[in-house]
UniProtKB/Swiss-Prot annotation:
This protein is involved in the repair of mismatches in DNA. It is possible that it carries out the mismatch recognition step. This protein has a weak ATPase activity. ATP binds at residues 614-621. Keywords: ATP-binding, DNA damage, DNA repair, DNA-binding, Nucleotide-binding. GO terms for cellular component: cytosol. GO terms for biological process: mismatch repair. CDD domains: ABC_MutS1 (cd03284). SMART domains: MUTSac, MUTSd. Belongs to the DNA mismatch repair MutS family. It comes from Cronobacter sakazakii (strain ATCC BAA-894). The keyword DNA damage applies. This is DNA mismatch repair protein MutS. The gene is mutS. InterPro entries: DNA_mismatch_repair_MutS, DNA_mismatch_repair_MutS-lik_N, DNA_mismatch_repair_MutS/MSH, DNA_mismatch_repair_MutS_C, DNA_mismatch_repair_MutS_clamp, DNA_mismatch_repair_MutS_core, DNA_mismatch_repair_MutS_N, DNA_mismatch_repair_MutS_sf.
Length: 853
């Protein structure tokens, strides 16, 4: 921006603009001028590129032409949505003064700041997805993380202990905007994320955070919220709350509490596991063929968002899960009656947030009224359902008969979009408003009478009375009869074929009508604001009702899914292990054209690891993933795709399946694989479910097999986790003979000549062969290459006596034999105590070691 000249050299309007822009230097400023929001200087250039709008110039100020771009005020929401999706923030500056009475530029001020994480307008939000603002803090003891959904008031804090846990939280919550301290050390953790906002250190100060939070909640301390002993989480929460207050510039009555999220309350899944299981997002970044796409047939947006939160944070409290299971079982026969009524409730949660922020529009209040009108029907439908938890939700839903009556009296049936358009308050609600409206609406009768009278009196048959927004009321006469008008007709406008006039009587009436319209509109705005004052005292009960309705939607949806997709209620037991009868993959079975082959699974302390072999495309990965998804579904309270399921305590789910280069971080496929494996070996427990697919394949055969063997050994013997271990290293099928708790299973296939038929059936024991060449032929590898490969395979098998492919000697694998022979030099070093040697003895040892190598 060209500001080298003195401030006084600018025009008064540009001085006003520059003052406001100086308060918001890092974000775009939408500056209201009449029917447009204008942007100037660098903002104009940036907006022109981002929004693909014209960049023009507006005169000059301080001797320089001013770059300018603008958007019409009636279409501003579309442009804001585009900017927010690009991660931009925008300050909205409105005219608050009256142009008619202003001397100099009309008074303006920034009334709100729209940022990706603080939007509540439905036009800017994705209705079936949470939109979170987050803040992250780090000190020597770990991380603090806070999230807020301003469109619901849901405020959460956590204290991830390490980088992996923090990465998993970022993946789970996927914030639209992330605040971080200016000295944040782990930038690689957040780089490349959308909506990053660097904040000064003082905003993360602990005492300030406590003060801010107590002020918001009207409390003396935070003990009642269970966050008092979470200093890192509070630092993040304090910064977040300050940012929301700065951007919203209004009170936030819907943010009434803060909740501590503890890892031990839910099943922990790291970022790789969430990605690999394709819970709400597939590996390509879309939403098709995910677990959510199968399970989410909710009928309200708030129900859909709640279901996705459940899927990303399964709970371990079995009493909560049993309540959900009982509710789902009870709702199964009622789902077809309940869902159509729930559909009419809409997104009450977000409407209440806009009510709290005083940004709710007339149609929001009409939708709220419509939601209230569904409650009596829902109450009647739920009254006969015996499940205790359904009755709890029914009580929390409430009735709100008084508020329903208020909105039925106050708001017309189909209100306009904006209150400033008028016609929002229903006739009969307020006597004075009806009087002003009658005066304004009576204009039509008066004008008809005036037109007939003047036409007959003057004998001008082309005379008619009309109105337009620019010139107001007028009497129009054709050009051919204009000579017949009397002297008191004052010409107001000349058209091609007509003249328009005003007379004192019509001018007087015009003033009266315009005054009445203005007064009616002003009174209507006042009454609309008073409605907020009447509704807001009930906000807490209304939010509780919205949460109950959302949960009822989720449970009814899960009941419908269970009934439609033949899911059964799992048994959650204290006995460790997982036992599935006829288990199915919930997503794959929906996309297959042929019947899905269901398979059993049995894991227990006595059979805690399955070594899974079989051909590529045989179904190993599907079998493993379906187990994890069934466990995940069971731990949100859902029924599962299995004839029977008995599932013991699970604290974490880990997956090490597939990998791609992480080129941005300079990590190869093998490095990514080993990083994920290290995370599992460090963090898995005996109650964890671990899926390991093709471990060690990214390096040489010797290295890969060694690593796979050692990892399997560690998981089975040291950690004792419930493990599904898929491999092409047939040497690993000897593990059951060497350690307890390990068993072989394989996916069946039948080879006939050059073709292969995958049976997708899980059988006990190891696979007899790999079928790799048959799969390669199926994939279209040229026949001459397959032929040469068969020839080479026979050569290799004869060279090694088939040892590399199938055999293991009495005590150890042939492939690992060389690796496991300890060097004499290493043995000598292991037995050596360097602290006991004199310099002379040390020198002698060097010569001795040299001779051993």
């Amino acid at each position: 921006m060209s500001t080298s000249e003195t401030f006084d050299a600018h025009t008064p309007m540009m001085q006003q603009y520059l003052k406001l822009k100086a308060q918001h230097p890092d974000i775009l400023l939408f500056y209201r001028m009449g029917d447009f929001y204008e942007l100037f200087y660098d903002d104009a250039k940036r907006a022109s590129q981002l929004l693909d709008i014209s960049l023009t110039k507006r005169g000059a100020s301080a001797g320089e032409p001013i770059p300018m771009a603008g958007v019409p005020h009636h279409a501003v929401e579309n442009y804001l949505a585009k900017l927010v999706n690009l991660g931009e923030s925008v300050a909205i500056c409105e005219q608050i003064g009256d142009p008619a009475t202003s001397k100099g530029p009309v008074e303006r001020k920034v009334v709100r700041i729209v940022t990706p994480g603080t939007i509540s307008d439905e036009a800017l939000l994705q209705e079936r997805q949470d939109n979170l603002l987050a803040a992250i803090w780090q000190d020597s003891k770990g991380f603090g993380y806070a999230t807020l959904d301003i469109s619901s008031g849901r405020f959460r804090v956590s204290e991830p202990q390490d980088r992996e846990t923090m990465a998993a939280e970022l993946q789970r919550t996927n914030p639209a905007e992330l605040l971080y301290a200016e000295d944040f050390a782990e930038m690689s953790l957040i780089e490349g994320r959308r909506g990053l906002r660097r904040r000064p250190l003082w905003e993360f100060e602990l005492d300030t955070a406590r003060q801010q939070l107590n002020l918001q909640f009207g409390t003396r301390d935070l003990v009642g919220f269970g966050v008092e002993n979470a200093p890192r989480g509070l630092c993040a929460a304090g910064c977040l709350l300050q940012y929301v207050k700065d951007t919203q510039r209004t009170s936030l009555p819907h943010i009434r509490s803060i909740t501590m999220e503890r890892q031990q309350d839910g099943i922990i899944m790291d970022a790789a596991t969430r990605r690999n299981l394709e819970i709400t997002q597939n590996l390509a970044g879309g939403v098709e063929n995910t677990l959510a796409s199968v399970l989410d047939c909710t009928v309200t947006p708030m129900g859909s968002r709640m279901l996705k939160r459940w899927l990303h944070m399964p709970v371990r409290d079995t009493s909560v899960l049993r309540h959900r299971q009982q509710a789902i079982a009870a709702l199964m026969e009622y789902s077809t009656e309940i869902q159509p009524v729930l559909r009419q409730v809409g997104d009450l949660e977000r409407i209440l947030a806009r009510l709290a922020l005083r940004t709710a529009r007339p149609r929001d209040l009409a939708r709220m009224r419509h939601a209230f009108q569904q409650l009596p029907t829902l109450n009647t439908l739920l009254a006969d359902i015996e499940a205790e938890y359904v009755q709890t939700l029914r009580e929390q839903m409430g009735d709100f008969a008084e508020l329903r009556d208020l909105l039925e009296r106050a708001i017309i049936e189909a209100p306009p979009v904006l209150v400033r358009d008028g016609g929002v308050i229903a006739p009969g609600y307020h006597e004075e408003l009806d009087e002003w409206r009658a005066l304004a609406d009576g204009a039509t009768d008066y004008l008809d009478r005036l037109e007939i009278r003047e036409r007959e009196k003057l004998g001008i048959d082309t005379l008619k009375v009309g109105f337009n927004a620019v010139h107001g009321y007028f009497i129009q006469v054709s050009r051919g009869q204009s000579h017949m008008v009397p002297i008191h007709y004052v010409r107001r406008q000349t058209l091609k074929n007509a003249e328009r006039y005003i007379i004192p009587e019509l001018k007087e009436y015009e003033d009266k009508v315009l005054t009445s319209k203005g007064k009616a509109l002003a009174l209507e705005k006042q009454l609309y604001d008073e409605l907020f004052d009447l509704l807001l005292p009930h906000l807490a009960e209304l939010q509780k009702s919205a949460a109950a309705l959302a949960e009822l939607d989720v449970l009814t949806n899960l009941a419908e899914r269970a009934d439609t997709l033949n899911y059964h209620c799992p048994t959650l037991t204290d006995k460790p292990g997982i036992r599935l009868v006829e288990g199915r993959h919930p997503v794959v079975e929906r996309v297959l054209n042929e019947p899905f082959i269901a398979n059993p699974l049995s894991l227990s302390p006595q059979r805690r690891m399955l070594i899974i072999t079989g051909p590529n495309m045989g179904g190993k990965s599907t079998y493993m993933r379906q187990t994890a998804l069934i466990v995940l579904m069971a731990y949100i309270g859902s029924f599962v795709p299995a004839e029977q399921a008995e599932i013991g305590p699970i604290d974490r789910i880990f997956t090490r399946v597939g990998a791609a280069d992480d080129l941005a971080s300079g990590r190869s496929t093998f490095m990514v694989e080993m990083t994920e494996t290290a995370n599992i070996l460090h963090n898995a427990t005996e109650h964890s479910l671990v899926l390991m697919d093709e471990i060690g394949r990214g390096t040489s055969t010797y290295d890969g097999l060694s690593l796979a063997w050692a990892c399997a050994e560690s998981l089975a013997n040291r950690i004792k986790a419930l493990t599904l271990f898929a491999t092409h290293y047939f040497e690993l099928t000897q593990l059951p003979e060497k350690m307890e708790g390990v068993a072989n299973v394989h996916l069946d296939a039948i080879e006939h000549g050059d073709t292969i038929a995958f049976m997708h059936s899980v059988q006990d024991g190891a696979a007899s062969k790999s079928y790799g060449l048959a799969v390669a032929a199926l994939a279209g590898v040229p026949k001459e290459v397959i032929k040469r490969a068969r020839q080479k395979l026979r050569e290799l098998e004869s060279l090694s006596g088939n040892a590399a492919a199938t055999q293991v000697d009495g005590t150890q694998m042939s492939l690992l034999a060389a690796a496991e022979e300890t060097s004499p030099a290493v043995e000598a070093l292991e037995n050596l105590d360097p602290d006991s040697l004199s310099p002379r003895q040390a020198l002698e040892w060097i010569y001795r070691l040299k001779s051993l190598v």
